[in-house]
Each structure stands twice: as C-alpha cells, then as structure tokens.
C-alpha cells in the first residue's frame, strides 16, 4: 500500500523481553552475557538476523538474583537508563549492576538465536544503528530485515539478506523451521511458549498502541520485504527531467511547487508495483515454479493493445491465452 492508504488505530499487541546469548566478542567482560531485547511483534523472532545498538548509549551488565524463572545468577545486558523500567515490567528486584560501558564496545560481537536448538543455528551479529533510542525497550533492537525499513536497510548495509518469512496469506513459509504453516497473527503464543522452554524469556505482557491498518479493509498491516518493480530515478536522467518539468509548470497555489519539488529531489527509485486487487495491474506473467517474470515484449505489447480496446478488467476475467 502507499503511505496515503495507511491509517492508524489503537491495537493491543503482545510484548516480550527475550535474550540472545553472546557467543563471540572481542571484549572479555561481555562473554557469557545475555543481550535482552523488547518487541511488540513476537512473531518476527523467527525472522531475526541481527541486533542493533547505539554506540552513544551507555549499557550495563546486570547480574540477576534468584527472582526470575530462567535467569538466576546470569548476566543480562540492557541500556543503563532503562534498567528500572525493565525490572518493573519483568517483575524482578534481586539484581546488581556489575559494569557500565559504552555501546561501541559491542563492535564485532555475535550472539546466538534463542531458537538455536530448533533449527536457527546461525550467527546473529550486533550492528550499530542510529535509529536505536531509549524511548522504549532495552536500548537494543531485535532486527528482522524482512519486516521493517530500518531493519532492512541496516542488514542490507552489512550484507545480510531478508529471509522469505511468510507467503501472501500471512503464513510462515517452509524456510521457517518449526513454525512453518502457522499464520503469523496466530503465532505469538507459540513463540512465547518456545522462548520460555528455551529459557530465553525474561518477561511478556500486552500493550495498547497506535498500529497501522488498511484504510479500505481496516485490517492490521505488517511490513514485508518482497521483490518489486522499480523505475530508476537516475537512469536516463528521470529525476533531472522531472525537476525541469516542475520548474516549467505553473502552480496554483505557487507553494505547491516547493512541496512536490522537495519530494522529487530526495525520493528513492519509484516503485510501480502493488499487491492489491484494485487499480491497474502490471501486465506480467510469473512462473509458479521459479517466480521469475516472463520477459517477452511481444506478449506485453499484446496485453497493452487489449487494455487500450477493452480496459484492464480482462486481466482478471479473460482466458490468459488471449
């Protein structure tokens, strides 16, 4: 959906505090510690590929006491400013801070996925991200490149690919060990249970917050990284031509010129594909086996001729052989 087609309504989400055990690090004082994250989307844990931190934030190693189910005498790591809030939300009081350090010490640190014994036995690197703040959570962000723009861009920068987490129906794909075949909105309870069984769950609860919904269907929305079709703004000088066209156009009111000009000056490549059942579809046939599009100019020209004569409804109603 386009941004203009998204509206925000109150929604109740499950929340979790869960840990990723450090497996490799350059800093001796970080060894054998557990990095704690907070998320309102437990269903994205199987899509996790990294943890994001802020090099300017101060973090603390907290030695836990005996009033938690899975973390007795273990060391956890959270942002220093958020210790009080996390301890209250996770209901533990028996702890002591044994060391405070700057976030840049996380460089070259690698963690294990909490589901490492369920088929998720890959490295989870810690990466610096300037989007990490102290507004909520633990100061360390669970990063799933398939399900968020910040996540995607940070992982892309470090060569981590987005996994094919789910299909078009919102069901975990075969690439997701243990949970494949489950609808993502029905998976939270399973994820929470397994995190507890893996002794990685520090706490969980619920949160009412503003959440994106489709303005047409009113259904809740999720971010999902998929292959799309783009028109480059740089090739064939499209951006330059568009800016010149704006300058050559008379605007009423005149202030509209600056608004659209600033939009074109900074916009990324133009995504022209959509996944929806209204509007004009792109005339593309895609192989069911390889998922590759049929790149045949003659066929595309034939479809264009049909559109000109009959409109686009035929794409949905006519025989594909036509």
Stretches found by the model and what they are:
Residues 1-46, 66-67, 108-110, 119, ...:
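Residue patterns forming the tRNA-binding/recognition surfaces of aminoacyl-tRNA synthetases
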Residues 9-10, 51-55:
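Phosphate-backbone binding and catalysis cores of DNA-processing enzymes
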Residues 50, 57-63, 67-140, 149-153:
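Protease-associated
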């Amino acid at each position: 959906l386009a941004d203009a087609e998204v509206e925000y309504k109150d929604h109740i989400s499950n929340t979790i505090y869960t840990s990723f055990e450090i497996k490799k690090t350059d800093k001796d004082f970080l060894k054998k510690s557990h990095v704690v994250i907070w998320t309102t989307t437990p269903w994205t844990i199987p899509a996790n590929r990294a943890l994001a931190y802020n090099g300017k934030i101060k973090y603390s190693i907290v030695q836990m006491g005996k009033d938690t189910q899975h973390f007795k005498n273990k060391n956890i790591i959270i942002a220093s400013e958020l210790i009080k809030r996390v301890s209250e939300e996770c209901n533990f009081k028996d702890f002591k801070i044994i060391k405070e350090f700057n976030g840049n010490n996380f460089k070259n640190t690698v963690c294990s996925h909490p589901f490492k014994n369920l088929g998720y036995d890959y490295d989870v690197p810690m990466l610096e991200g300037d989007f990490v703040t102290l507004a909520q959570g633990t100061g360390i962000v669970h990063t799933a490149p398939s399900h968020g723009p910040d996540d995607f861009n940070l992982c892309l920068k470090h060569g981590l690919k987005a996994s094919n987490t789910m299909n078009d129906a919102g069901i975990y794909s075969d690439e997701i060990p243990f949970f494949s075949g489950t609808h993502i909105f029905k998976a939270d309870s399973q994820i929470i249970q397994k995190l507890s069984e893996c002794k990685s769950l520090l706490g969980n609860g619920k949160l009412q917050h503003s959440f994106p919904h489709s303005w047409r269907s009113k259904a809740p929305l999720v971010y999902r990284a998929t292959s799309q079709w783009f028109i480059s703004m740089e090739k064939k000088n499209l951006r330059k031509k568009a800016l010149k066209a704006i300058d050559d156009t008379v605007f009423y009111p005149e202030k509209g010129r600056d608004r659209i000009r600033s939009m074109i000056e900074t916009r990324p490549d133009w995504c022209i594909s959509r996944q929806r059942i209204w509007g004009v579809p792109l005339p593309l046939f895609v192989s069911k086996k390889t998922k590759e599009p049929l790149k045949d100019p003659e066929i595309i020209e034939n479809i264009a001729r049909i559109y000109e004569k009959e409109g686009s409804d035929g794409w949905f109603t006519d025989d594909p052989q036509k």
